[in-house]
Amino acid sequence: MRIDVLTLFPEMFSIFNHSIIGKAIEKEILKINTVNIRDYTIDKHKKVDDYPYGGGAGMVMAAQPIVDAIKTVKKENKGKVIFLGPKGKTFNQNLAKELAKEEELIFLCGHYEGIDERAYEYIDMEISLGDFVLTGGEMACIPIVDSICRLVDGVLKSSESYEDESFYNGLLEYPQYTRPAIYEGKSVPEVLLSGHHENIKKWRKAKSLIITNKVRPDLFKKYKLTEEDKKILKDFNKKL
């Protein structure tokens, strides 16, 4: 997958040179480029923003450098142009899965009070990280790109690495434990030490269902319980 990020602060994306994403870039599974929007302004002082028409607080990013940056990147990257903004669709795991199927994507990070409305003509999709305000689109772009990239084939060692994680199948993840088996008098659940894979699988599913219902009832209501899920919960409750 190729991703181009249009931003005023390309240095912020050096985080992708590390950990799992960094290794995937080294293996050429991923290619993440940053493009400095300021390089495309025609203003002699390298300005990319100006005061809003009609008055108001703050500054607005001008259309010209944004549009010229998009046009240049589009010569090599034919992917969707995604703007990180508050009016967009709220990002979630299902959207991450959909975007992970794409071969190319372009992300546009806004700043200041937003972007000139005329730049929207070159944008295919707007995504929001949630109902809160951030200093710039970069803060939203980094977790969104990370979430998408880790679902790309070959980035993680196996699909099991993300299929059991929170949100992937509509549930929160089950509790995890590592050595030692007893810490401060608290033991790892016996089933996890049993080596019985089927019982471990059922315990994890039951825990995911119970935790989701308790912590995120909104998610649990959307989740469609199967007959197997109901049986797993019934058997689990019998053992309590």
From Swiss-Prot:
One of its GO terms (biological process) is tRNA N1-guanine methylation. InterPro entries: Alpha/beta_knot_MTases, tRNA_m1G_MeTrfase_C_sf, tRNA_m1G_MeTrfase_TrmD, tRNA_m1G_MTases_N, tRNA_MeTrfase_TRMD/TRM10. Gene3D superfamilies: 3.40.1280.10, tRNA(m1g37)methyltransferase, domain 2 (1.10.1270.20). It is an enzyme of class 2 (transferase). It comes from the Bacteria. NCBIfam families: PRK00026.1 (NF000648), trmD (TIGR00088). Belongs to the RNA methyltransferase TrmD family. This is tRNA (guanine-N(1)-)-methyltransferase. The gene is trmD.
